[in-house]
Amino acid sequence: MDSQFLSVSRPQLDVSAWTPQKWFVQGALRSFEEWSAWQYIVTLLIAIITYDQVMYIWRKASIAGPAFKIPLMGPFLQALHPRFESYLEQWASGPLSCVSIFHKFVVLASDRDLAHKVFKSPTYAEPCIVPIAKDILGHKAWVFLQGKAHAEYRRGLTPLFTNKAMETYLPAQERVCADYFDKFVAASAANNGQPREFMTLFREINCALSLRTFFGDYISQDAVKKIADDFYLATAALELVNVPLSMYIPGTKPWRGKRTADAVHAEFARCAAACKANMATGSEPTCIVDHWVLHMMESSRYHARVAAGEEGVEKPTNVIREFSNQEISETLFTFLFASQDASSSATTWLFQILAQRPDVLSRLREENLAARNGDRFKPFDLPMLESLPYTTAVIKELLRHRPPVIFVPYLATKPFPITPSYTVPKNSMIIPSCYPALHDPEAYPNPEVFDPDRWITGDAEKQTKNWLVFGAGPHDCLARRYVPLSMAGMIGKAALELDWVHHPTERSEEIRVFATLFPMDGCQLVFSK
């Protein structure tokens, strides 16, 4: 019996077919098959959040910044309504710091020398302003070009800001100032002499000054008013980070900004065509586009004569290629973008601070009256504007104290070893900051005090590495001489022809960040003759 029992055959298991790995896979598959759609969604979301968090920590490495990122969106809500104090805290956190908003990793360089390194490293970084900027300004806009293509544009544009050229822009600027100063007084009278915000009118006068300088009388007053009213929509669209694809959603800031930009581009192209037709008749240049088109015509005639075999042909001072109406439009649109908010900010603070500092305004007034030999209605010209040391000091101190450009976003086109210990990842934004260098107490003692004399009796003029108002490197501002002279013309004329009183509020010194810096209360003033 025992032997029979022992001889009964038993089923044989194929052990090789059931490894632990296969048991696990089979069990997992059965588990997944039982999952609901919500379980799949939650698992995918957790995986995405984990990946996003790990990538942030890896990109951050050793630089300052939050230890962890708010899942996916990062500080997006704060970016929609930026606080200036938050920027100060970020800059103070370290020479390099970072944030990550949605998919975009952003590195801020607050150290002066690191800012210079970014500005002067075109092989590693290119200007991007914000990710959506190319859609608004134009993908082929010259500010985004590098190397030979950028140099070609710059060579053609630089002569537009020589003394000879700038002298021809001033009569139109004088007329714009006279027109808008009357509007300032009328606006105060219409408000029964009560204070009102003037930031809006300051934006309008600066838009008019820019457009008349760019296009002279080729652009109508209605178009000037329309662009001045609408251009803030283009600025509002250029937030540091936008919701993906929002440019295609009607009613969003990027959608409205794109439509505004397209309309301005079309108007500028029309003005360029009108200019070419007018200059072909032999007219004298009176605005930027006139000078640019004249240089094209001179270059074309030169090339034609050389090609015809003429010898001893005099070469023009600025030999350039023919630029299309669209190229002219895109270029002058970038000029307007660069100038509109920056000049509006500078003008707003200048009028507010001078009203608060009657001692400064009195000295500025005396200097401008003396330069006009006692005739306060004498039009300004270039030699006059270049002979106003105190007015120049006031302008420079204003640009340092309340810089109209606080940083300039760049895009890392390849891994950028910005320090020996940190490399900015490719496709990250790297933002050199200008404000910290301009408020460095080692370069400018008591940097929060508005003190024009630091440019006369102090050594502020020697702090050239800290003077980042107009950037540095191959993409620095072409108008670094034009801007202070234009501001001097406007404020000198205002000082002699107007009185204005600032009515401070609890928010007058609170800084609003809208592309640049503005007083939070809009600058409450009353103007009179």
Swiss-Prot record:
UniProt keyword Transmembrane helix, yes or no: yes
User: Which Pfam family, an example, fits this chain?
Assistant: p450
Cofactor names: heme
A GO BP term, please?
terpenoid biosynthetic process
Oxidoreductase: present as a keyword of the record?
A: yes
This entry's Enzyme Commission designation comes to 1.-.-.-
Q: A GO CC term?
A: membrane
Q: Which residues cross the membrane?
A: 38-58
The record's listing under SUPFAM superfamilies reads: Cytochrome P450
Bilayer disposition of the protein: Single-pass membrane protein
Residues reported in the UniProt entry to bind heme: 477
Q: Name one GO molecular function term.
A: monooxygenase activity
Annotated family: Belongs to the cytochrome P450 family.
What is the annotated role of this protein in its UniProt record?
Cytochrome P450 monooxygenase; part of the gene cluster that mediates the biosynthesis of the sesterterpenes ophiobolins, fungal phytotoxins with potential anti-cancer activities. The first step of the pathway is performed by the sesterterpene synthase oblA that possesses both prenyl transferase and terpene cyclase activity, converting isopentenyl diphosphate and dimethylallyl diphosphate into geranylfarnesyl diphosphate (GFPP) and further converting GFPP into ophiobolin F, respectively. Other sesterterpenoids (C(25) terpenoids) are found as minor products of oblA.
Q: What is this protein called?
A: Cytochrome P450 monooxygenase oblE
Organism of this sequence? Emericella variicolor (Aspergillus stellatus)
Source lineage? Eukaryota, Fungi, Dikarya, Ascomycota, Pezizomycotina
